[in-house]
């Protein structure tokens, strides 16, 4: 993987309170099986962070989450035996009102956030940040799917269903909303970003054409 350094990496996992602990246990178990090392080695799941300063930022972010009331479920430290830029991915049980969950971090830190109520409540939590690049929902409920991808659903440029936020390399239009930018790469919208579009109307009739067929008798 990209060790959380991809722009579409998952930062928040919003889970209904009724299954929160079950999901937390499953995630911690999965994280415990991840193997760090050289990305070209067989069986390695993730490599180092790009700079030592990024490692410092990562550890500071984990500590900030704990200071704000988060519960560190796993990870968060360095792995010096592998090199200066290796860290253990962290999961923090958090709440949506913690300021740290509003910030973007390029590192392997995931906030696990519970919600009460309906899918609309979960979407409100998801949309309640300044960033808006990628989002995803995992559900077998068609109504939840339709709500998530509708005008009242995810406000991100990318909305995936039963697929992670990193999505799939399918050549579709790629881009975000809010502080995550504007415009699109790839797909039919991609080349339009590099153009200056102009609407041109040429009238060869010899008569003046007015909008909506309006005529003035002078």
Regions found by a protein language model. Give the residues of each.
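ALDH superfamily catalytic-core signature
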Residues: 1-96, 120, 124, 161, ...
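Conserved C-terminal structural/oligomerization subdomain of aldehyde/semialdehyde dehydrogenase
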Residues: 35, 67, 79, 86-218
């Amino acid at each position: 993987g990209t060790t959380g350094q991809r722009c579409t990496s998952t930062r928040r996992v919003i889970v209904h309170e009724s299954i929160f602990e079950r999901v937390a246990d499953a995630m911690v178990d999965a994280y415990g099986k991840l193997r760090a090392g050289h990305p070209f080695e067989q069986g390695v799941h993730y490599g180092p962070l790009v700079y030592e300063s990024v490692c410092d930022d990562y550890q500071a972010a984990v500590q900030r989450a704990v200071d704000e009331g988060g519960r560190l479920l796993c990870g968060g430290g360095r792995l010096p035996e592998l090199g200066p830029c290796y860290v253990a991915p962290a999961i923090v049980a958090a709440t949506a009102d913690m300021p740290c969950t509003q910030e973007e971090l390029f590192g392997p830190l995931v906030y696990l956030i519970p919600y009460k109520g309906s899918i609309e409540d979960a979407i409100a939590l998801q949309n309640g940040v300044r960033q808006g690049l990628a989002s995803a929902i995992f559900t077998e409920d068609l109504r939840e799917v339709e709500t998530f991808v509708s005008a009242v659903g995810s406000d991100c440029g990318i909305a995936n269903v039963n697929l992670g936020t990193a999505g799939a390399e399918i050549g579709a239009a790629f881009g975000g909303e809010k502080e995550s930018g504007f415009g699109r790469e790839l797909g039919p919208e991609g080349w339009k970003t590099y153009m200056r579009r102009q609407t041109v109307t040429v009238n060869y009739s010899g008569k003046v054409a007015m909008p909506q067929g309006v005529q003035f008798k002078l």
